[in-house]
Amino acid sequence: MTLNPLVQFDIKKLIEIKIFGFDISFTNSSIYMLLASILALTYFYLAFYNWKLVPSRLQVSAEIVYNLVADMLNQNIGAKGHKFIPLFFSLFIFILFCNLLGMTPYSFTVTSHIIVTFALAILVFLTITIVGFVKHSLRFLTLFLPHGTPLWLAPLMIVIELFTYLARPISLSLRLAANMMAGHVLLKVIASFTISLMIYLKFISIPLMVILIGFEIFIAVLQAYIFTILSCMYLNDAINLH
């Protein structure tokens, strides 16, 4: 693992399960997604089960996260977005805990795999599309023709806008997976060099690793935020036809 920084992303079967020829084996990826969900639920249960008017530090931290997501929806969509707070709050928390869990030694970074991030992105994409059609019916299709487009340019613009719309889940998932993978590969490579140089540069190598880990934690939080706020912007397009 020290020599190959990509080994940390290998998916390993722990319990092999096949149903009608479909492989639905329980893997290390499954464990870390389940663990991230359990940790998130435990965190918010402990934060809110004994809610107080004068909040504890844990309650304050949970309220900050909730208000962050609520503000995202309020700023992008307005009052119409309040009903979607549970969805986007769950999305943000799941990605955040998966990212942070991947920072622990010898763990597995679930969000470095495109299949996981694409599943999240396609869930958001389908939800937003359904919301658009339910709210606007066939008028939702006007999203693909910008207002004021000349008639002769309409066919080309429809194709471009449709392609852009369909590319959203791809770009959303690739951005998250690529950033998480790149960050962990870089951290692994530098960590390998740091171990080799500790004999000669121990006063530099250890602080360098601490700085890099801190930066990677920042990236983990930032990527969860970016994924969620872009999803909010896409929902705004569907609701307000922007």
Swiss-Prot record:
Gene: atpB
GO CC annotations, alphabetized: plasma membrane; proton-transporting ATP synthase complex
Alphabetized Gene3D superfamilies for the sequence: ATP synthase, F0 complex, subunit A
InterPro entries, alphabetized: ATP_synth_F0_asu (IPR000568), ATP_synth_F0_asu_AS (IPR023011), ATP_synth_F0_asu_bact/mt (IPR045083), F0_ATP_A_sf (IPR035908)
Pfam families, alphabetized: ATP-synt_A (PF00119)
UniProt KW Ion transport keyword: yes
Chain's role: Key component of the proton channel; it plays a direct role in the translocation of protons across the membrane.
Annotated compartments: Cell inner membrane
Main location (coarse class): membrane
Summary of subunit composition and partner proteins: F-type ATPases have 2 components, CF(1) - the catalytic core - and CF(0) - the membrane proton channel. CF(1) has five subunits: alpha(3), beta(3), gamma(1), delta(1), epsilon(1). CF(0) has three main subunits: a(1), b(2) and c(9-12). The alpha and beta chains form an alternating ring which encloses part of the gamma chain. CF(1) is attached to CF(0) by a central stalk formed by the gamma and epsilon chains, while a peripheral stalk is formed by the delta and b chains.
HAMAP family, per database record: ATP_synth_a_bact (MF_01393)
GO terms of molecular function: proton-transporting ATP synthase activity, rotational mechanism
Protein name per the record: ATP synthase subunit a
Keywords, comma-separated and alphabetical: ATP synthesis, Cell inner membrane, Cell membrane, CF(0), Hydrogen ion transport, Ion transport, Membrane, Transmembrane, Transmembrane helix, Transport
Family: Belongs to the ATPase A chain family.
Transmembrane segments: 31-51, 84-104, 114-134, 140-160, 189-209, 210-230
Membrane topology term: Multi-pass membrane protein
